[in-house]
């Protein structure tokens, strides 16, 4: 085959015309020291705060300390894969996480990588992990109820969509159980739930996922897990990642619920990272910005205005106390940030009162605004009555003869405490809660022995479902009790009591 000179020159001209000068410039630094999940890097002069950095062997980091002569970065991965002298590349992007509907039903780690063995997640969008919370103009007051399905909470410490309600208590008092019941109760409520496991045992996370699968709640839930065996950097980041995933749904006009279990472990992880980065320690060796660590996370929970789509992000953070001390540094910080707290007490838990809520110390600062009118009508004075009952019960231990009114109050209180007990993983529809609390507060249970209350509850609800379904439907639709409806409920209670054998 003979090549003509004209063809060769034409081909060369075409190649020269199509030639593009491509110069790929990337700023590179060198690891000067590495250890305890933190790397010191020299040479990244233009690095941004919270920027993602690319290290060898697929390890990523995030710049936390920007100092004169080096950058302190936390690593998301095994620091044994990185050694002194390794090259570090800037990515030019701050820390991001994959978000979207593709993550629903999956278990991911703190950087959005799936760890449930179901293959990769092809998320179409990503969001910055740490963003500024919505401003005042973008919000509206919390006024829509988020039903937990727990009688004690929905009646006395109501939670609204967009609220931040702290669940606080010692270890093994049922904190996670409240979160799981709330997640299970969101089934069919158009609410996406994100459960963030921070610093927990892997076995505990497996149990949570299995429980959610068993009750069909994984269909609307994302689990973000940063277990105790993972680096402190992952435990520090996980709550922000969970929050960013929730914000995606909030900004689409949907409702989301994020459960942070628990923020005490996040504070421990942040303290560890900060001390290794040589940040000055403050009270209890925490860095000075540990309040900001939690406030900037929890402020992102919001009920957006109608102009912004009307979506909401509700936060249920958990704090673990030591020996019931709510006056510790981290507990007081988070109590002051949130819109109320549910305080769980070991003494009540061991006495068989579950959920073990101390009504006197628990509060919702949103209050009745987050309840439907029917619940406000039946449970308005319940909190006060129960708090009075607790005081009287303590006093009655020393008094031999009590007057009739005091005895009646104690009797009613015992029955209400029994009525508010609830088994785990059986959240109750709000219309059923209203009828039961109505029966208790109107004195229809006063003539029943305390031991028969549970049997009455189960029997009455099955009687209503089989014969008086119209009452449930009416409460659901009207959302308030008029005199006619009250009479219908009273008649149903009296009719059932005729056949009820305690």
Swiss-Prot record:
Keywords: ATP synthesis, ATP-binding, Cell inner membrane, Cell membrane, CF(1), Hydrogen ion transport, Ion transport, Membrane, Nucleotide-binding, Translocase, Transport. SUPFAM superfamilies: C-terminal domain of alpha and beta subunits of F1 ATP synthase, N-terminal domain of alpha and beta subunits of F1 ATP synthase, P-loop containing nucleoside triphosphate hydrolases. Disulfide bonds: none annotated. GO terms for cellular component: plasma membrane; proton-transporting ATP synthase complex. InterPro entries: ATP_synth_asu-like_sf, ATP_synth_asu_C, ATP_synth_asu_C_sf, ATP_synth_F1_a_nt-bd_dom, ATP_synth_F1_asu, ATPase_a/bsu_AS, ATPase_F1/V1/A1_a/bsu_N, ATPase_F1/V1/A1_a/bsu_N_sf. HAMAP family: ATP_synth_alpha_bact. This is ATP synthase subunit alpha. The lineage of its organism: Bacteria, Pseudomonadati, Nitrospirota, Thermodesulfovibrionia, Thermodesulfovibrionales.
